[in-house]
Swiss-Prot record:
GO biological process: proteolysis
Class of enzymatic activity (EC top level): hydrolase
Function: Hydrolyzes the N-terminal methionine when the next amino acid is alanine, proline or serine. The substrate preference for methionyl aminopeptidase activity is Pro > Ala > Ser. Also able to hydrolyze the Xaa-Pro peptide bond when the first amino acid is alanine, asparagine or methionine.
Keywords in alphabetical order: Aminopeptidase, Hydrolase, Protease
EC number(s) per entry: 3.4.11.-
Originating species: Escherichia coli (strain K12)
Cofactor note: Co(2+), Mn(2+) or Ni(2+).
Protein name: Aminopeptidase YpdF
Similarity comment: Belongs to the peptidase M24 family.
């Protein structure tokens, strides 16, 4: 089913005549570019893109099947949308109420000649098109190569910021537009911080270092986490204080991946990982969800959480990222992006998940 066909089915289900899209993430599949500017209006009969002169030429080359409108001082959002409303005799117009300010919503309510209804079309992004899957697969490939590069690069005596800068630079060389979010590098005791962004801390031999990072490629994100052991004289994985914790996290992650298949509820996948960690005695040290959907945004719905009852379907892409965090000692997290297939699940990363030492060829 095409993007417009899916959206029109959604309009019927929501009992709406049309929808006005204003958020970057919901406009991007229509515009072909990522921008906070411009609007998309989709009715049951027509499709419209409204952009100003900065984006008109670029969007014009991509906007097949859409009527393209130039926004300027005369042709405003209100003018153009009201003309569409009049031409098609629209009665109800959905808008992204969760994405716009109260002031904007109030102004639209008074200026647009249709009944405005807050509606959220985010659900339409849960199942990716084959083209979207391919872009995310390529974004994951960049992250995968980045993980192996940074594993060899890291040495004791480097700062976390130096490591993050090298990783982000390498991913850009591989084709990434930029990092898909602020890179996390958390070594030693900072590994107990689930979102420990890279700091000036110096990594030391024998420490675990958790790297959580991703690449943005053609508007789509990857998200990957590996916990590595910083190499040095006498360093041994098996003798590390958190070696057993690492094995528990890995078992939890593999259990969750094994649970992924069409028809399974998201909460069941979360339970598969959480049960392993809880039975090992670390349930109180795993405080976040097991994973989340990924696409145009790093964090999308549905979530692998205890409360999410969404049923998995082929074409969904989600992360699986359990972790254990021990204050004062450190932590371990392992994360993959997983594609739900008709048969089960496909992990989009190739890097091994055993304890790997840094610096080794």
């Amino acid at each position: 089913m095409t993007l417009l066909a899916s959206l029109r089915d959604w309009l019927k289900a929501q009992q709406l005549d049309a929808v006005l899209l204003s958020s970057r993430q919901n406009k991007q599949p229509h515009l072909g570019i990522s921008t906070g500017s411009g609007y998309v209006v989709i009715s049951r009969e027509s499709a419209h893109i409204l952009v100003d002169s900065r984006y008109y030429v670029e969007v014009e080359a991509r906007a097949q099947g859409y009527q393209l409108h130039l926004l300027d001082a005369t042709n405003t959002l209100t003018t153009i949308v009201n003309q569409i409303i009049a031409d098609e005799q629209l009665q109800t117009l959905g808008f992204e109420g969760q994405q716009v300010s109260w002031e904007t919503a109030h102004r639209w309510q008074s200026e647009l000649n249709a009944k405005l209804v807050s509606a959220t079309p985010d659900v339409l992004r849960q199942i990716k098109t084959p083209e979207e899957v391919e872009k995310i697969r390529l974004a994951c490939g960049i992250a995968d190569r980045g993980a192996e590069h940074i594993r060899r690069f890291i040495q004791a005596g480097m700062s976390e910021r130096e490591i993050a800068a090298e990783l982000e630079w390498f991913m850009r060389q591989q084709g990434a537009e930029k990092a898909s979010f602020d890179t996390i590098v958390a070594s030693g005791w900072r590994g107990a911080l689930p979102h420990g962004k890279a700091s000036d801390k110096i990594v030391a031999a024998g420490e675990f270092v958790t790297l959580d990072f991703g690449a943005l490629y053609q508007g789509y994100c990857s998200d990957m986490t590996r916990t590595l052991l910083v190499n040095g004289e006498g360093v041994s994985a098996e003798s590390h204080l958190l070696f057993n914790v690492y094995q528990i996290v890995l078992q939890a992650q593999l259990a969750a991946i094994s649970a992924i298949r069409p028809g399974v509820r998201c909460q069941q996948v979360d339970d598969a990982a959480r049960r392993v960690i809880t039975e090992a005695g670390y349930g109180d040290y795993f405080g976040h969800n097991t994973g989340h959907a990924i696409g145009i945004e790093v964090h999308e719905d549905p979530r692998f959480s205890p409360r999410d009852t969404t049923t998995l379907q082929p074409g969904m892409l989600l992360t699986v990222e359990p972790g254990i965090y021990l204050p004062g000692q450190g932590g371990v997290r392992i994360e993959d992006v997983v594609l739900v297939t008709p048969q089960g699940a496909e992990v989009l990363y190739a890097m091994p998940k055993t304890v790997l030492l840094t610096g080794e060829a």
